[in-house]
Amino acid sequence: MFQGAIALSLDAKGRLAIPARHRDALVPDGAPLVITAHPHKCLLVYPLSAWEPIRDRIAAMPGFDPRTSAFKRLLVGFAQEEGLDAAGRVLLAGSLRQWAQLEKQVWLVGQGAHFELWSDAGWQAQQEAMLALTGDALPPGFESLAL
């Protein structure tokens, strides 16, 4: 289970060092991880075993609706399988870095079964948007949580 928000830095080659405490769960037995684009201009980072059922469900959706086709192209079309190097770093494809507007400072944000990877500016904008929602009613499903 991935949780927490961690500020990290990309190196000059576009590599991200995955925190040691998450490596075994993210790449069990050296399996690749999957990185893909998200419509909110961040990246999704999944263990391969968690991504495959999602990919299969997406691929099985009919492509007649233009929105469905667009999401399939985004989520499956951008998906990259990558391994970690000996230093625990993953190379982020240039197309993915460009999509999410990633520069040096990034945020790795746990979402349970996967991570989101945000640019610093994108993450700060998300935080501001979240604070703006605090006066609104809770989203469906959250009402019963005792927080």
Curated annotation (Swiss-Prot):
Annotated SUPFAM superfamilies: AbrB/MazE/MraZ-like (SSF89447)
Molecular function via GO: DNA-binding transcription factor activity; transcription cis-regulatory region binding
Domain SpoVT-AbrB: 5-50, 79-122
Entry-linked CDD domains: MraZ_C (cd16321), MraZ_N (cd16320)
UniProt-listed GO biological process terms: negative regulation of DNA-templated transcription initiation
Highest taxon listed in the record's lineage: Bacteria
Sections of the chain in a coiled coil: none
Keywords assigned by UniProt, alphabetized: Cytoplasm, DNA-binding, Repeat, Transcription, Transcription regulation
Cellular component GO terms, alphabetical: cytoplasm; nucleoid
Protein localization: Cytoplasm, Nucleoid
Pfam families: MraZ
Family the UniProt entry places it in: Belongs to the MraZ family.
Assembly: Forms oligomers.
NCBIfam families given in the database record: division/cell wall cluster transcriptional repressor MraZ
Name the record gives this protein: Transcriptional regulator MraZ
UniProt source species: Aromatoleum aromaticum (strain DSM 19018 / LMG 30748 / EbN1) (Azoarcus sp. (strain EbN1))
